[in-house]
Amino acid sequence: MYLRSGLIALCFFLLAFTGVAQEKKRLSHDDYAGWKTINRSQLSPAGDWAVFEVNPQDGDGELVIRHVESGRQFVVPRAYRASISPGGKYVAFHIKPQQAVERQAKVDKKRREEMPVDSLGIFVFGTAGLEKFPALQSFAMPEDPSDWMAYIIDQARIETVEEESPEPEPEDPGQEPASGQEEETKKEKPGRVLYIYNPMTGAVKEVKHISAFIMAPAGNLVAGLTVKENKDTLSLYEVISVGLPGLTAKTVDSRYGEMKNLAVDRPGEQLAWLFSSDTTKAKSFDLYLYQQRRDRLNQVVGSSTSGMPAGYGPSENSTPRFSHNGERLFFGNAPLPEEEPEDTLLAEEKYRLDIWHWEDPMLQSQQLVMLNQLRRRNFQAVYHIRQGTMVQLADEDMPSVSLDPESNATRGMGQATAPYMIERQWTGGNPRDLYAVDLLTGQRKRVASRAEANAAMSPGGNYMIWYDTGSTSWKVYHMQQETITDVSAGIPFPVYNEDNDLPMFARPHGLAGWTPGDEAVLIYDRYDVWKVDPRGRRPVENLTGGYGRENNIRLRIQDLDEREHFVRLDKKVLLSAFNENAKRSGFYTLQDGRLSQLLMGDYLYSQLERARDAERYLWRRSTYTEFPDIWTSTADFSQGVKISDANPQQAGYYWGSVELVEWQDFDNETLQGLLYLPEDFDPARTYPMLVYFYERSSQGLHQHFIPAPSRSTINRSYCTSNGYIVFVPDITYKEGFPGESAYNAIVSGTKAMVERYPFIDRENMGLQGQSWGGYQIAYLVTRTNMFKAAMAGAPVSNMVSAYGGIRWQTGLNRQFQYEQTQSRIGGTLWERPIRYIENSPIFFVDKIETPLLMMHNDADGAVPWYQGIEMFVAMRRLGKPVWMLNYNDEAHNLTRWPNRMDLSVRMYQFFDYYLKGEPAPQWLKYGIPATDKGRVDGYELVE
């Protein structure tokens, strides 16, 4: 498919308006900070109010509170982490200190306890009033409809809240705090105070000396732990319950020691917590249960409880959790802590050592990364409240037990990974044995061995399901009948990814969910949704009627109600749609067996949300030129209205356009890619072209890229605004030949573009990519000289040495990447040594004639930065132009704003010099000596 003629026609159309176009600006690095994103959008339960954050990339953001129908809008500066009350009458949120105030506090070297802190903001819908309470620690709301909320204020830190002039309405109308709060603050500062508050009535209850609190999901109770610390004795802890709406407080328990990990059941009738009376640092805890209706308090589990493994007790690193029906209390047990002997050695008198043992389940490097997690490890148990019995469910051999969402079923799914831990070093997968676990007795039965993908419980707890990689099918285990059924056998199409080009099993397309009562499981093939009987008695049913496959449209059910565990086919079901050929997207409905199109177009539609109690929807819509603002509509989607405008300044800048292109690679396979052109494109001119790639990218035809400082890659919007064409080819791979596969796709695609479009300057083309893309660049410059300059981020240059390397962020060894996953060698170093050498750029550095800029950071947790060093010193040894940017203490992709800004400047200076003929910057021509580090940036251009 050739570049659509409409694009070329558009270019001539634009030429007719050059006078207007010249008024626009080109994007610069100074523009990044003010470009905004939209985050955390949500609808009120009735769908009448929308709330979302609008945040610049650097600076103070804002919270937008908008009435959907009228468009009336309120903006709260610096507000974030908003929660709409389940009753739908107000929204509460954090309010940050001003960024400038925080910065000044750091400049002034204020202590942590003196730093400015968040405030609480509450906005009641339909008013212009904003309540603000300083020194917020946290707040919470129940799950069920209610007007109540609870929050903690740290009275001792109120003075650290910034003093600022009142903001104009409706941002800050200056209302007084809720009744009783200001007066109490004047009398004393008791530390952390819990306020239980109803913003609709002003009713408030305070609980001093609060340590932690929790709200019952039903919204009828707040429980808290209070603590009064004593210097010479144990602290006095109390469990306080406050009933709603009456605000009746009750002391449930009072003891000297330590209480923690408070839990409450759904109706607010039972409380649980851990308590220890130990005075030592290593504390043993007991589990307590309070039943409100009976006003009964019991220690229900301790280290000597029947059923407790020897030497174990309730773990302080696990918070108890009630089942939905309140009949079970789940918690974790762990070995009892032992007091460490007194240490009298000085630091310089101790050895420091890691011992790597060949039979360790995990490498030492991985153990050290996970050290805190391993120390906090505990094993799930259950206390059956009616029976008064404890059952241990998980243990060292089977450390994980999954339950149904409401934890009401009598069986769970156990998972044991220990038999396969060592081999994960080179397989990279996560095989496990699956067990059916009886929650009443703790008995377990092994159901499957070496299950590798997508194991889960059905929502009703009647079945276990997993994808069997050997048979490429979905298997279901019936908990009661203890039988296994191949449920996808009747689906006439693959239920796995047919495009898989990794030397490992193909991943399944996944599950859409289950129908009520676990009556059917919904399974995806590439395009459609299938209804399958988990017992295998009824024939499979294609719910979408083959429409997806017939039209090359991938249909996926949207889960829009977090309270719903099932897919209810008796109601309207919404599906997302993506056309794999044209890259168009949209939404469909499935109702009464009929599939209907709601919305479909040349956009990327995403982030669909629905109001809890109304047919009101939010979604995002974007193209390369259109920012993904928020749109809203009712159920038919026919009258969509845009309710945000995050970046109106974009209209004043040159941008660009993108088209889907096709070509034949050197093996005559048809590939797709994306070609981006400048907005003020003139087909009579030639333009330098940057070629960027990773693997497959054409599905992102309508992805929008806000101008942003680079983490590691080019910004396509910045490039087209500044006169670059950008080509992004798809790459397909052959096992054992990752480098040559990249060459086949990228070089063939680049040649096809320059032969097809004379406006591409074939003498001024560059390469850019990061990580796997960086490796492919390092390989390409050893195979071709058609590119004038290349920039590679975090490249693997030597697969031989990288094979035995460590991914330091996780501690994992890298062997699995070459044998099973992305690097695609498909065998070990000793099985396929030639493949490792042939695909390693380091062995062919003498062929390189392309100037190469690399970025490889010394805290890279994915690709050891020694790989960049190997490439650098080899090219330096051969006198070839090469530079390496090493951002100190930075990760695989840059995280710190100053580093991102710096990389953006240097990367585009590099390309501008080689591809546009602009003067070289000082750093590129002369470097920067270590003696000038941090003092000289070298940005100045040298004529």
What label would you give each PLM region?
Residues 1-23, 796, 805, 858:
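Bacterial Sec-dependent N-terminal signal peptides
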Residues 21-617, 622-628, 632-633, 921, ...:
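Beta-propeller folds
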Residues 373, 561-568, 653-668, 935:
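Surface beta-strand/loop "capping" patches
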Residues 391, 413, 485, 631, ...:
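Hydrophobic/aromatic beta-strand patches that form the interior of the parallel beta-sheet core
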Residues 417, 578, 622, 692-696, ...:
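Glycine-rich His-Gly loop
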Residues 479-495, 536-550, 593, 635-639, ...:
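Active/binding-pocket-proximal capping segment
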Residues 490-502, 637-639, 644-764, 768-770, ...:
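Cap/lid segment of the alpha/beta-hydrolase catalytic domain
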Residues 705-943:
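Active-site-proximal cap/loop segments of hydrolase catalytic domains
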